[in-house]
Amino acid sequence: STAVRDAQQRSGVAGPINALTIDVEDYFQVSALAWYIRRDEWDTRECRVEANVDRILGLLSEHGTQATFFTLGWVAERYPEMVRRIVAQGHELASHGHGHERASDLDAAAFRADVTRAKAILEDTAGVPVHG
């Protein structure tokens, strides 16, 4: 990832220092709750993602650590400023799909459409290319 390469250059260490990734999704979007919280109910739930990401950003800043944030397109649409803060603080932005679909539940065309949609939303929101 870009974050790892940047850390290597700053430290002068040839190998990876760490590879820290963070999934940016809300509690109600995990597949374990899919039977209890339908997608059409997501917008009715209290979102905690922004407060949690801001806390993580603070901790990473405090420790001089960079990470890759795998972010849902759904989240980026609702919290564009948060996505821009992630990038502004030097972290790598990557796609976690749009609606947290399980890849095993999608055919190739649906998977491609989901990933393409999320990538476009993330790039348009953050103004940086998304490679992951």
In which residue ranges do the predicted regions lie?
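Catalytic alpha-helical scaffold of carbohydrate-active enzymes acting on polysaccharides/glycoconjugates
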Residues: 1-132
